Every structure is written in C-alpha cells, then in structure tokens.
C-alpha cells in the first residue's frame, strides 16, 4: 500500500511534468510549418522550422492532421487537469470519476473537432472531425448533427473540466447584480 505522502508527491510530479510537456507541445503547435518533414508530410528537405525541433515537427503534424485546431483543446484539458491536481483537493475523487473525466474529455474532443469541421474550412477539425461530422450528417442531417454535437459538448465540458454549470451561472449572476448596484449607486450620486 502506498502512503498518502508518496501518492501526493507522485501526483504533483506528474502534474508538473504534464504542464511542462503541454508547454513544449504548445510551442511546437504554434511554430508548426507545413513544409517541415514530419509524420504525415514526407519531404526531401532536411530544414526544420519548428521551434520544437524534429520531435516538435512530428508531434504538431500528427496532432494537426488528426485533430486539427482542437489540438489546442487537448493541451487545455491537460493543463486544467494538472492545475486542479496541484492546487485543488477534490474530496470526491475516485477511480470512477477519473475514468468518467477521461471518457468525457474524449467525447468533448470528438464533438469539438466535428463542430470545427462544420464551421471552419481547410480541415480545421482534422481527420477525426471530418469523419465524425460526415457520418453524423449523413445519418441526422446538418442541423440534427449540430444539435447532437452541442448536446454532447455541454455536459462533456462540465465533466472534463470538473466544474458545475449551476455554480458558474450563480457566480456570473452575482457579479452582474453587484455590477448593476454599483452602477446604479454611481449614477445616482
């Protein structure tokens, strides 16, 4: 049996590693150059313009080809998970919750890729978005598939990022009310 100290230290180490790895992948994605020799792009040129080097060129090419612009969502999910592990103690954390978060992150990624594929051109959703959206559109039509994807996107984002929509709306409402009263008192004075 692993003690709580060792387990927490291991989780913190993995979280910091995930943040550093996500930062490297972010640099590789931002400096992506389609002319770099990479995983899906074989060229005779040996010149690599990606700031992540040959590994960054391969990783960014793979992510952009498969997931499109949703590659940045993968990084966001990883960073949010790492920050929540480091800074917030979840009293309801369990193996089933971790599995649900993984599955909901995957559903969120698929839905986001498909919506990007519909709204933006040039393969913005990657191969995954194209395949899923074309098959859903054939089965449900364009509007039906968009409704289906949004219905999955909303709860998947809540489960993946570990937040409550009700608490978020409540906080937003209290901010609006306090802003309204401050504006009213300012205008009346």
Which residues are covered by each model-predicted region?
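Alpha-helical transmembrane segments used as membrane anchors
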Residues: 1-189
């Amino acid at each position: 049996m692993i003690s709580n100290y060792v387990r927490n230290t291991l989780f913190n180490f993995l979280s910091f590693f995930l943040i550093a790895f996500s930062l490297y992948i972010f640099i590789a994605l931002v400096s992506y150059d389609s002319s770099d020799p990479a995983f899906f792009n074989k060229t005779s040129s040996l010149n690599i313009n990606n700031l992540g080097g040959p590994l960054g060129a391969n990783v960014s090419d793979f992510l952009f080809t498969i997931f499109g612009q949703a590659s940045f969502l993968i990084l966001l999910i990883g960073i949010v998970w790492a920050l929540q592990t480091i800074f917030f103690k979840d009293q309801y954390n369990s193996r089933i919750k971790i599995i649900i978060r993984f599955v909901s992150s995957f559903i969120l990624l698929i839905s986001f890729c498909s919506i990007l594929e519909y709204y933006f051109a040039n393969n913005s959703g990657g191969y995954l978005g194209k395949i899923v959206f074309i098959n859903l559109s054939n089965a449900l039509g364009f509007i039906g598939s968009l409704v289906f994807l949004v219905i999955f996107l909303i709860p998947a984002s809540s489960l993946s990022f570990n937040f409550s929509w009700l608490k978020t709306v409540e906080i937003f409402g209290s901010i609006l009310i306090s802003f309204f009263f401050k504006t009213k008192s300012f205008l009346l004075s």
